Amino acid sequence: MEDVFWGLMIPLLGTTLGAACVFFMQGRLHRSVQRGLTGFASGVMVAASFFSLLLPALEQSAPMGRWAFLPAVIGFGVGVAFLLFLDHIIPHLHMNAETAEGPRSRLKKTTMLILAVTLHNIPEGMAVGVVYAGVLAGSSGLTAAGAMALSAGIAIQNFPEGAIISMPLKASGMGSWKSFFGGFLSGVVEPVGAVLTILLTSLVVPLLPCFLSFAAGAMIYVVVEELIPEMSAGEHSDIGVVSFAVGFMVMMALDVALG
């Protein structure tokens, strides 16, 4: 159980260390740096969705024969729909955006910025939680090392996210500690979501392939709806694409080497 605890907390550690950059760096991150970090995070999330979630889901559904794709397809679709639903009911503001999404709200821009990253982190916490739930249930295709690889990959891409959220908060006039706390707070949802997912999945172990693909669908939604537009906005640049490839390769290597 100690390994599970650390596996759930490592992603939050990545966010916390990234948010701590606010104490050592001044001003906003350069636009090209933001693009690079966002592209890297996108690559990690896409690779994690495929290698750590969808592939195990398909492997566990193999006894269904020609219908083995059904749990993965259904779970993936429901995961996308779930994030789409949250996107419409939670007021939030994406990085470098002028207008907020979701219902009208009197919340401060800084609060809605934190909500945007928190919304982004929900599927990451679910992904870690559902993989560890599979490990605890002894499901085939899921190992403790593979689960730790996913946690490490999420933590790596959480580091730049922590900086991306805390530094604009400080640049907007917020104090260093409050900015750090804002970045940290956006990542707290991950271990909370992971624990809730473990508890829920443990009740319906036969549906694990659906839960795995659900988390994958939610993560892909975040990448397509939020991260890819952010890394491609403004003047043309290859930084986002190259960083995406690097992030994908890093996560793929982690999953294969440790999984």
Where are these regions (language model features)?
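Intrinsically disordered, metal-sensing/regulatory segments
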Residues: 1-259
